[in-house]
Amino acid sequence: MRNNTLKIYDMLSRGGFIAADSLDSTTRHLFDDIEENYEDYADYYREIGLRLEAGNGYYFFSRINEGKQIIEQKLDSFSKWLDYLDFLKCYDQTFTAGFQFRKSHIIEQISVDLELKEKAGRLFKKYDSSSNQDIVTKLIQEMMTIGFAECINETDETYKVTSAFRYAEELVNMIQIANEDEIPE
């Protein structure tokens, strides 16, 4: 067993990501350790039913032999990220790994862009979030919880999108490619 097995498990088992470009030195160290010892970690986690997956600058877990119900739950859970991604790309088409943004700028853009305002209103309907600030705060919290963004300046609330965000983009691209490949009736 490698030294960081438990730390890696704790971060990834909750649906998070370990990104190469994280601001957190511990996370970057874990990324480097996984990269150097990928086979050892992959073999270990495989024994407990987890698949250590590598993306473009990030790592995550998937389960081996997931049942249909679990896959459906994951798809349902990911459907909200389709809306989030749509909103973020509407805010700025260059919103991807490495992008930096300020919370206040997104809030300002919502107030001047009708399409963005409509998309924002649909993001957290079940919470009845009426203020743009609440909506943006919840979105940023979700991005930070999963590891898609990190705060780089607490004073002016500036954030950086991590390479783990590519996971969401890649899933959406796979869905779009699958739809394009379908033969119309």
Name each model-derived stretch.
Residues 58-62, 156-162:
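Minor-groove-contacting beta-hairpin "wing" of winged helix-turn-helix DNA-binding domains
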Residues 53-108:
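Short basic alpha-helical hairpin corresponding to helix-turn-helix/winged-helix-like nucleic-acid-binding
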Residues 7-21, 84-87, 96, 100, ...:
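Leucine-rich, amphipathic alpha-helical/linker segments
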Residues 46-54, 144-154:
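A short, conserved structural fragment
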Residues 1-73:
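Eukaryotic partner-binding/assembly regions in large regulatory complexes
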Residues 73, 157, 164-185:
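Short, amphipathic alpha-helical interaction segments positioned at domain boundaries
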Residues 33-41, 128-145:
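Short amphipathic alpha-helical interaction segments
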Residues 112-134:
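Short, positively charged loop/turn segments that connect secondary-structure elements
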